[in-house]
Swiss-Prot record:
It comes from the Bacteria. Its cofactor is Mg(2+). It is an enzyme of class 6 (ligase). This is Phenylalanine--tRNA ligase alpha subunit. GO terms for molecular function: ATP binding; catalytic activity, acting on a protein; magnesium ion binding; phenylalanine-tRNA ligase activity; transferase activity; tRNA binding. It comes from Halalkalibacterium halodurans (strain ATCC BAA-125 / DSM 18197 / FERM 7344 / JCM 9153 / C-125). Its main location: cytoplasm. InterPro entries: aa-tRNA-synth_II (IPR006195), aa-tRNA-synth_II/BPL/LPL (IPR045864), Phe-tRNA-synth_IIc_asu (IPR004529), Phe-tRNA_ligase_II_N (IPR004188), Phe_tRNA_ligase_alpha1_bac (IPR022911), Phenylalanyl-tRNA_Synthase (IPR002319), tRNA-bd_arm (IPR010978). It catalyses: tRNA(Phe) + L-phenylalanine + ATP = L-phenylalanyl-tRNA(Phe) + AMP + diphosphate + H(+).
Length: 344
């Protein structure tokens, strides 16, 4: 029995030393030291030994069990250290390699344009006002001198929720709401940036959703020359000092008189080209003197107060300034397009 125990010990230790995985070592533990293992079987046969042999064989069996256990413990520790070393080797970082550059974002071209325009008009004494995108029929139309039968109120031009609620078609309702708040006492000098919505088919120059910036100045003695001076200052600052503007007669229900405002073409410098359709001028916004009826509906006495208003499309300004040929580029989230404006 002594030879049997020593052979078991040597065989187990040899297999433990050859094992390369923890799973194999665990299997050896179960095989030799488990309840059905050979060492346990030897201990169960102790009753057949003589009284003189029992303590000797019992001590040897315990020594064999302890030797196998220590070999298993030592091997498990070695395998764990080897696993740690392997992971460290795989995850080693070469600190001498150059770091990866941090990708920087930038303002969307429309955001950059709005910020630039806001800064320009704030420098001219205007403040920024905002209003709801879901607007009432009254503020979107009636308060702006667009009666019930006006063609601009056709369902084909507007997104209605109910008969009285719609997505605003312009930021002009902010002007009407602001004038109401002042309760007939000026001055008011604001710009109103924001999203507007119209039932247009999307193409290179039209979108069902776009950005507008409108302006309003109401005070005693405001004249058309004041409007022209403000817009001239804006055009020179936004497009360049060499640019000039011209005012053409037009019609808007909420202004009287009304004008379309053009800026001199920056490509041909007024000589005529494909971009300006050989006219030397490019339309940039609509404007005019606030209609007396609009002043009156907002609580101002048109005999005491006058004012001007203007409205411009942010996408159009961006397209003209940066040479963008399709309004849809602003809304496709193409990183190749947007990356060009990181410094804008």
């Amino acid at each position: 029995m002594r030879e049997q125990l020593e052979a078991l010990r040597d065989d187990a230790i040899k297999k433990i030393e050859q094992a390369q995985e923890k799973k194999v070592v665990q299997e050896i533990r179960v095989k030799y030291l488990g309840k059905k293992g050979p060492v346990t079987e030897v201990l169960r046969g102790m009753g057949k030994l003589s009284p003189e042999e029992r303590p000797v064989i019992g001590q040897l069996a315990n020594d064999v069990r302890e030797a196998i256990g220590k070999a298993i413990e030592s091997k498990m520790e070695a395998l764990e250290q080897a696993e740690i070393h392997r992971k460290l080797q795989e995850e080693t970082i070469d600190v001498t390699l150059p770091g990866r550059p941090v990708l920087k974002g930038g303002a969307h071209p429309l955001t950059a344009t709005i910020t630039e325009v806001e800064d320009l008009f704030i420098g001219l004494g205007f403040s920024v006002a905002e209003g709801p995108q879901i607007e009432t029929d009254y503020y979107n139309f009636e308060a702006l001198n667009l009666p019930k039968d006006h063609p601009a109120r056709d369902m084909q031009d507007s997104f209605y929720f109910t008969d009285e609620l719609l997505l605003r078609t312009q930021t002009s309702p902010v002007q009407a709401r602001t004038m109401e708040k002042y309760k007939g006492k000026g001055p008011i000098k604001i710009i109103c940036p924001g999203k507007v919505f119209r039932r247009d088919d999307d193409d290179a120059t039209h979108s069902h959703q776009f950005m507008q910036i409108e302006g309003l100045y109401v005070d005693h003695g405001v004249r058309m020359s004041d409007l022209k001076g403000v817009l001239q200052a804006f055009a020179k600052s936004f497009f360049g000092e060499e640019r000039s503007i011209r005012l053409r007669p037009s019609f808007f229900p909420f202004t009287e008189p009304s004008v379309e405002v053009d800026v001199s073409c920056g490509i041909c410098h007024g000589d005529g080209c494909r971009v300006c359709k050989q006219t030397g001028w490019i339309e940039i916004l609509g404007a005019g003197m606030v209609h007396p009826r609009v002043l009156e509906m907002s609580g101002f006495n048109p005999n005491e107060y006058s004012g001007f208003a203007f409205g411009m499309g942010v996408e159009r300004l961006s397209m003209l300034k940066y040479g963008i040929d399709d309004i849809r580029h602003f809304y496709t989230n193409d990183r190749r397009f947007l990356a060009q404006f990181k410094r804008v």
